[in-house]
Structure formats: C-alpha cells, structure tokens
Regions:
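PGST-rich, cysteine-poor low-complexity/disordered linker and tail segments that act as flexible spacers
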Residues: 577-654
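Conserved N-terminal/central alpha/beta ligand/cofactor-binding core
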Residues: 2-4, 10-20, 38, 44-45, ...
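Surface-exposed loop/turn motifs at beta-strand-loop junctions within extracellular Ig-like
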Residues: 53, 562-564, 745-747
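Aromatic, loop-rich ligand-recognition surfaces of beta-strand-rich domains
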Residues: 486, 498-501, 506-520, 576, ...
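N-terminal Rossmann-fold NAD(P) dinucleotide-binding loop
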Residues: 32
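Short, aromatic- and glycine-rich surface loops/edge beta-strands on solvent-exposed regions
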Residues: 554-562, 739-743
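Flavin (FAD/FMN)-binding glycine-rich loop and adjacent Rossmann-like elements that form
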Residues: 3-5, 10-13, 58, 140-141, ...
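Beta1/beta-strand and adjacent pyrophosphate-binding region of the FAD-binding site
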Residues: 17-29
Length: 761
C-alpha cells in the first residue's frame, strides 16, 4: 500500500469512529471489568474504554498490586467473606491458572474474560478527554483518543459508568465531587484525620528483583535519591521484600493527586532507584550481590483523588456499627485504612488501620451521581467520606460494587431505560438485589427467594448427609497460640464435646465457650462459659459439658487458652463450614492479636481470631454428643451460597462412596438451565499477584460430577471443575420428573458439598 498526499492548508483531522451502545464504561480496572462482564452477560451492549494497554488498573502488570477486599489477607474476623459473582470467578480462575501470582498471566486472565463476552466492545489505549451533554444534568456522549491507532472514538449511550479512578467523566460533566478529608463535625466521624496527619492518600510504585546466580553490579542513575538521608524509614528496605510488599513506598498525599501525578511518579522513581542502590551498594546486604532489578513500575498506583457525591455518603459509622440499608447491593470488609500524607517521607507508621467486627453493607444510593442523571459511580469514585473511602477503596470491594452497577444497568434497560436514581425511587431495588443474588453476589442479611427456581417446589433426598459426631485424632500440636474450634450450633443447649490432649507436665486446660454479639459476625466477643480443668501428665480425653445455652443459631467458638505444656490432637479432615481460628498476629493488616483503639476515635476494641492458611489450620480432633446435623439436603434451598450463621450446604458423609442428591417433582418439568454452587473456600483471600498459593483448586471444591434424569440418562457431566458457580445451559431442554446429581468427594479427607442447585425452564 502506498499513500502520498500533498499539502493540506486547512490541516487534517484524525479518523473518527462512532459507537452507539447501551452502557459506556470509562475505566478498565477491576471495577470497570466486573461492571462490563456483569452487564454484558445480561444482554446489555457495553463499550469498555481503558486508557492503558491492559486491563486491571492497579492489579495489572503495570502496577502489580494484589487484589484484596473483605478477607484482608485472612487477618481479620470476616469469615467466608471473599467477594462473590464475577470477581470471584476471576480470582478463582487466576488461582487455577496462576497460583504463583504472575502479574502477566493475570493480565491474560482479565483479557480472556472480557473478550469472551460478545456484548462488550473493548477499546484499549483510549483516553476519554471530552464529555458532551444533551442537558445540564444528562450526558449524551464521550470522546476518547487512541494514540496507538490515531483514532478518535465518540461513544453515545443512555447510561455511563465512570470507573476511571480520577473520575474524568464525572469531572468533565460537572458532577459534584470532593477531594481531601471531611471535618469530623460534618458526619460525626471521630476518626476524621487532622491536617497534620494528612487528608489524602498518596500513590505507590513498586519494583521486582531476581537472583541471577552470579555477581551483578548496579550504578544508580543520577536522579536517584540517597534514601539513607531522605527516607526516615530507610532501614526497612531489604533484599527479601519487593513488589507490593513495599506498599509503604507512597507519596503525593500533600499534592494534587490528579494533576501532579507525573511529578509524584518522578519522586517515587528517585526513591526506588535510590533504595536499590542502598540494598546493592551499602554493604548491609551481601545476599544482594547476585541480585538485579527485574522490573520497576512506570505508572503510579493511585489510592485516592476525587470522590463523587451520590444520594448518600457512606461514613465511618456505617462501617463500624455495620448499619443496615434497605438498598444494600454490595459489602465491604477491609479495615478503615488511612495513611500519613507524607508517605515514605514520614516518620509515622505507613498506615493507621482499624477493623470493624464484621462486614458492612454498601447501599445503592452511593453508586450514582446526585447531579448527573445517567452517571454511575464505580470503583474508588463512589459516594463516601474520606474515612469510609479508606475501607471501600480496595479492589475486590470496588469490583463487587461494579457488579451491582452492571446489574443496575440491566434493570434500567429492562424497565425502558430508567436513570440510575429511578431504580431506587420507582421501587426496583428488590429486583436489583434479586438478580445480584442469583449470580452468587453475597449481600449480608439478604437471601435469594426465587419463585422461578423449580428446586424450591421439589422434594429432596440424598444418599447421605454428613453428621459431625467425631473427628479422628491424626496428630497433636502444642497450644502455642490460643485456638478455637468454630462449630455451627442451634439455639438452646450446647452438646457435650470431648477433646484429646497430650499433657507434658501437670497443668490446667483453660476453656471458654464464646459466640458473637451480632448475628452473622465471627468476632467471639461474648463469653458464655469458662472452665478450668486440672490435668496430670499423659495422654487423655477430656469431656466438656456446658450449662450455658446458645442465645440463637450461630457459630460457637470453643476456645483453648495458650499453654505450651498441652498439645491438642488435630484431624486431617476438612469440612465445608467447619474450621479453627487462632488468636494470631498479622502485622500486614495491623492485627496484633487484639485491637485496642484510643477512646476518642469511634472504633471498637476486640480480639482477632483468624484461620491459618492451608496446609495448616487443621480442625481439632473431637467427639460431639449429640452430633451436629446442619448439613442436610434441605440446605440447598436456603438461597445463600456460603456459610453465614450455619454452613448453608449439603455435605455428603465421608463414608458414602457415591454421594448423590436427588431432586424430585410430582409432575415432569421442562428444564433448560441448571445452576450449581460449589465451595471454593470463601475464606481464602486469593491474592492475585506475588504472594502465591499452595493449591490451584480449593480443597472443598467438587471436581467431578454428573447429572442424570429420571431414566438414568446423563444430562450433563463435568470433570475437573474448579469454579464456584457452574451454569449449565442445555442445548435441548430435558423433560423429567427427577434429576440426580452424582458427585465425587474432592479428596480422601474432604467430603463433597454443594451450596445450591437451581433449575429453570
């Protein structure tokens, strides 16, 4: 091809491409991605505009921050709190493909998920720079430019979602926004920071290192800083930590975190290259002689800039008090996590985290602009105070919010293109909640009640159901850390529990029976009974009988005080909804075993009881009389797809070598779709990069199953499952009076389980 053009006195214009769509999403971070996929799967035509070459934002290979949310590195009391829906699907997929946490592979996981959706048009490397409005309060279109193909895109849509991080669409459209911290008097937030501490969170950039196996020299660039003089905490640098383990490499909280970003980047580069000079050339790290820099970030990962105003602003009290909202569509659970504005140049600790006792609801009213009729607010732009934002800002929470927005766009379309606020004012929030729950999106305190689900009218039987009568004693471990066996109990009397101990010397076994003061929480802040049992040296069984009663259906914590003279026997058996928790320390999330805040900051004091990551974290060997039986087949009708106040799962007996669940109807039913929900361990955080995981498939997940009709014909069969939700859309509907689901146990130590089965015509 040959092109030759003469002089054009009037100049030239770039190529222009028009798009007319139903939802335009600006921002391809995790929130934008989950918004797009959720909407697209419901039939909404989506244009997803991302100004970077890859998707994922701060989770991408350009920044390399791990994805976290309510699970908080398994360092808080939020059990089974990993976010559901599309973000769960992504994290489970990434763990399966990429358990080592390679950020480049995670890029590919996100790209795969997006391009698999025919209703999504993806525009990468495209920066939106202009908004056109048809009225003062209504956006008509946005313009973006892609420097890679020199093309201008004009995107028209009835609905827009700004998930851009800095809020370019909201800003250009004139929507009300805030930057900086509110005074404590405005919302009654006692944790509102002082100007001296700082009113903005800064940016971070990271670096990766590798050992080459041979000496490598390093000459720092001229712009590198002498960190021993410029960084007060320079001695924290070491040859072992890299990537987002250096989250405290933060700067910009005293600057304009939108318009000063390029200068902030240069300032962070000075620190990074200076830090590596210190590690390589100070002589303090001889192990660094053979190490080299493998990667340095080229764009900052942003924490905070603009926050936009919706019909409600989430605040500190919503999080700490776990306030309930009729329009709840998502939840959070990260700590309220403020950082000193001076960041890496501050002598203060890099963060100031305070946890709530459990997860909190996020209302729909926070997810759209109060000024611009057709603008959703996604990601870190949602309507929240600076203090509340310190919790909602993390990526898994932002993604969960994005899924609510994507589903809201579907509801708006189905109801003849409502505006976002109309979903609230015209009474469609229950429809929104219903559709979200169907996807596996957990909303605390809500359960799915689906009249179209044929299973709800069916009779259920199973070849067996697990009963927790005893766990075998496989090995013993000393009680070096206080440990609690979490057990799902009904209201009323507490069963007798027998444990097995090995006593090194005469001592006493200190036992407490605890539960939570709030239904659905897992903070054992209520002590029901205390026992002290004298024990002589030797191995023996100890029977615990309690006079206390459980006030309601909930998890009880059978807690054993730290005592190195005692070893408790453990089992290798793991069961859905049954686990141990430990009074552990996790400094990464400011968990020091107990949270003891100052009296005047509006936070609560409590102990942390957290599981250990596999392969650790074994259940205690115990005997229970009468046996616990919350694992029956009726659990698949509960409308909840994770443990809450009970396991909420059918669990087969371990000795059942061919577990089967049968669904029967009085009359034959025509079935086109079957939804199955398996246990992928919602307690496991599934950090997306760097950290790595011991498994690529979660220990509780059923790998192999088949579904047969009333004549024994196989309707569907799957081997090698690893996902939470399996949606089976049959090419031809099956007419049958029964379906039988036959499952294999995940392993010899884990019985098969199933949270839910749904069937639709």
């Amino acid at each position: 091809m040959k092109i030759q053009e003469g002089f054009a006195a009037e100049g030239r214009l770039p190529k222009v491409e028009l798009h007319h769509t139903e939802l335009a999403i600006i921002g391809g971070g995790l929130s934008g991605v989950c918004t797009a996929i959720t909407a697209a799967r419901k039939g909404v035509k989506v244009v997803l505009v991302q100004d970077r070459p890859v998707l994922g934002g701060n989770s991408s290979s350009e920044v390399r921050l791990w994805i976290l949310g309510a699970t908080s590195h398994l360092g808080n009391n939020n059990r089974w709190s990993r976010e559901g829906g599309v973000v769960d699907e992504i994290l489970v997929e990434n763990t399966y493909r990429n358990k080592e946490g390679n950020s480049l592979i995670f890029d590919a996981v996100l790209l795969d998920k997006v391009i698999a959706e025919p209703n999504i048009t993806l525009l990468l490397n495209t920066a939106v720079y202009e908004v056109d409005k048809k009225e003062d309060d209504t956006i008509a279109s946005v313009k973006g430019f892609c420097s890679q193909n020199s093309t201008e895109y004009i995107i028209h849509a009835p609905l827009f979602c700004d998930a851009s991080g800095d809020g370019i669409v909201g800003f250009l459209s004139g929507a009300a926004f805030r930057m900086g911290a509110e005074k404590k008097e405005e919302f009654g937030e006692k944790f509102a920071p002082t100007e001296e501490y700082g009113e903005l969170l800064g940016h971070s950039m990271y670096f990766y290192t590798k050992d080459t196996g041979r000496p490598v020299k390093y000459t720092a660039p001229a712009f590198a800083m002498d960190v021993s003089k410029g960084v007060p905490k320079f001695k924290k640098f070491n040859a072992k930590e890299h990537g987002c383990q250096l989250w405290w490499l933060e700067h910009g909280g005293r600057m304009d975190t939108v318009h000063d970003t390029e200068q902030i980047k240069w300032d962070l580069w000075k620190v990074i290259y200076g830090a590596w000079d210190y590690i390589k050339n100070s002589g303090n790290f001889p192990e660094a002689e053979t190490m080299t820099l493998e990667w340095v970030g080229t764009i900052p990962g942003k924490r905070e800039s603009r926050r936009f105003e919706g019909d409600y602003m989430l605040r500190q009290q919503d999080i700490v008090e776990q306030r309930e909202h009729d329009d709840a569509v998502a939840y959070g659970g990260w700590s309220i996590d403020l950082h000193p504005a001076d960041g890496v140049f501050s002598e203060k600790p890099g963060c100031n985290q305070w946890h709530a006792k459990g997860v909190y609801q996020i209302p729909y009213r926070c997810l759209y602009s109060k000024n611009i009729k057709n603008l959703f607010l996604g990601g870190r732009l949602i309507s929240a105070t600076h203090v509340a934002f310190a919790s909602t800002r993390v990526m898994a929470t932002a993604a969960h919010i994005g899924q609510a927005i994507g589903m809201a766009a579907y509801i708006a379309k189905e109801k003849q293109y409502l505006y976002p606020r109309d979903i609230l004012t015209k009474g469609f929030v229950p429809d929104l909640q219903h559709e979200l729950l169907k996807t596996g999106q957990h909303i605390p305190k809500l359960v799915l009640q689906d009249e179209k689900d044929l299973v709800q009218q069916a009779a259920l039987t199973a070849s067996s159901s697990f009963e927790l009568a005893a766990f075998d004693a496989d090995f013993a471990l000393p009680i070096d850390t206080a440990v609690a066996q979490m057990l799902p109990l009904e209201a009323g009397s507490v069963p007798d529990i027998t444990v097995e101990v090995d006593v090194k010397e005469d001592t006493s076994l200190q036992v407490e029976l605890r539960t939570s003061s709030r239904a659905g929480n897992y903070t054992p802040d209520v002590t029901l009974e205390i026992q002290s049992i004298p024990l002589a040296k030797g191995r023996r069984k100890v029977k615990l009988s309690f006079s206390a009663t459980m006030p309601e259906r909930a998890y009880a914590f059978l807690t054993f005080h730290k005592n190195s003279a005692l070893s408790l026997f453990r089992t290798r058996t793991r069961v859905t909804g049954i686990l141990t928790a430990f009074n552990l320390i996790n400094k990464a999330v400011s968990n020091f075993g107990k949270q003891t805040p100052p009296e005047d900051i509006g936070m609560e004091a409590f102990e942390f009881w957290c599981p250990q990551r596999r392969p650790d974290g074994h259940n205690l060997a115990l005997q229970i009389e009468p046996a616990l039986t919350p694992f029956g087949v009726e659990q698949i009708k509960t409308g909840v797809y994770r443990p809450t106040t009970a396991p909420n799962a059918w669990v087969a007996a371990m000795e059942d070598f061919a577990p089967q669940l049968k669904i029967s109807w009085e009359e034959p039913q025509k079935i086109r779709q079957i939804d199955l929900f398996f246990d992928t361990d919602y307690d496991h955080p599934m950090e997306s990069v760097l950290m790595g995981h011991p498994e690529d498939v979660m220990a509780f997940c059923v790998r192999n199953y088949k579904i047969v009709d009333d004549e024994g014909r196989v309707v569907f069969e799957k081997e090698g499952n690893y996902q939470s939700m399996n949606r089976i859309e049959l090419e031809e509907p099956v007419t049958t009076s029964a379906l039988t689901i036959i499952v294999d146990h995940p392993s010899a130590n884990v019985p098969a389980s199933l949270f839910s089965v749904r069937c639709y015509n």
